[in-house]
């Protein structure tokens, strides 16, 4: 039985995508891998097809016109056939032992007739070229080894929040939430890690470093100068996150979740505001004012 669909969105990922895909293959009998070739102009399509030819029972390839990271996630979710779903960016990779732990837990649940709507694991900021690593844990928020609800969670630290890298969702939860990511837009992972949360009724935390988030490419969207260049996209995503969930409704059922989600919106607002201030132009000031006015009405 295959338990997790891994979707790997790829755009001109030839230099590093093998590291990512190879990290998913050790347990290929239990996973589905969907490689999304998002209109690449390098050797990405050929590499993807090579994997599909070598591992036809595990790897599927979708070739599509370029639509950006969000469209790749959308395509993967639309074609996912497993109970659980996770996005792995093509320059990142998973830890083998951690993946084994997760699969063993899923097998155990299957025998018991149980399931989790959302699985949370640690992730690692991996500064590969500098040989530095920093693990981001959630052991202060979630009790390990127990099926939890939002009413059971602890308090997130100021720099701690749920991100795409740390989450595995039950596929049906994602579909039920209606999460669809905008095309040709950066920072859409904020939507993916936010909108489905009110639909999650069972949470399971494994205190293991599953996801390695590669830091080091100059064109990464988290780079400060790149973020300033793409500030309109950051604002666009911030507005979507701020308006896609009725937090008053969430508060009635899960007050702790509502508190977390409110803080999440506040963090995104702060990021947008600070970078608009750093840009410092008259146009940036107008955008900052418009953003705050938008927030007041939503």
Mark where each language-model region is.
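Short, well-formed alpha-helical segments that are part of the catalytic scaffolds
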Residues: 12-26
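Short aromatic/hydrophobic "clamp" motif used to bind/position activated sugar donors
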Residues: 85
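Glycine-rich, basic loop-to-helix element that forms the pyrophosphate-binding segment
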Residues: 64-80
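Acidic helix N-cap motif at the loop->helix transition within catalytic regions
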Residues: 16-18, 42-51, 63, 93, ...
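C-terminal subregions of glycosyltransferases and related glycan-biosynthesis enzymes
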Residues: 214-298
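Donor-binding/catalytic cores of nucleotide-activated saccharide
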Residues: 69, 92-203, 211-228
């Amino acid at each position: 039985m295959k338990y997790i669909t891994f979707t790997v969105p790829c755009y001109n990922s030839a230099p590093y995508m093998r590291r990512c895909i190879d990290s998913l293959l050790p347990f290929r009998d239990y996973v589905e891998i969907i490689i999304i070739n998002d209109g690449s102009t390098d050797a990405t399509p050929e590499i993807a097809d090579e994997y599909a030819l070598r591992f036809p029972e595990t790897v599927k390839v979708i070739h599509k016109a370029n639509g950006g990271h969000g469209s790749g996630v959308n395509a993967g979710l639309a074609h996912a056939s497993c109970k659980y779903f996770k996005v792995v960016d093509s320059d990142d990779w998973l830890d083998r032992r951690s993946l084994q732990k997760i699969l063993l837990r899923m097998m155990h649940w299957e025998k018991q007739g149980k399931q989790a709507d959302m699985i949370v694991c640690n992730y690692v900021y991996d500064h590969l070229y500098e040989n530095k690593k920093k693990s981001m844990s959630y052991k202060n928020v979630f009790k390990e080894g127990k099926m939890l609800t939002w009413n059971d969670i602890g308090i997130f630290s100021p720099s701690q929040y749920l991100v795409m890298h740390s989450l595995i969702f039950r596929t049906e939860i994602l579909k039920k939430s209606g999460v669809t990511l905008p095309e040709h837009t950066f920072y859409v992972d904020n939507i993916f890690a936010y909108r489905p949360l009110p639909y999650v009724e069972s949470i399971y935390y494994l205190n293991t470093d599953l996801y390695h988030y590669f830091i080091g490419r100059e064109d990464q969207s988290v780079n400060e100068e790149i973020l300033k260049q793409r500030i309109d996209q950051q604002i666009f995503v911030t507005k979507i996150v701020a308006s896609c969930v009725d937090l008053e409704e969430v508060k009635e059922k899960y007050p702790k979740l509502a508190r977390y989600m409110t803080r999440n919106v506040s963090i995104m607002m702060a990021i947008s505001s600070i970078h608009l201030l750093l840009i410092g132009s008259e146009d940036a000031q107008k955008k900052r004012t418009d953003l705050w006015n938008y927030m007041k009405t939503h």
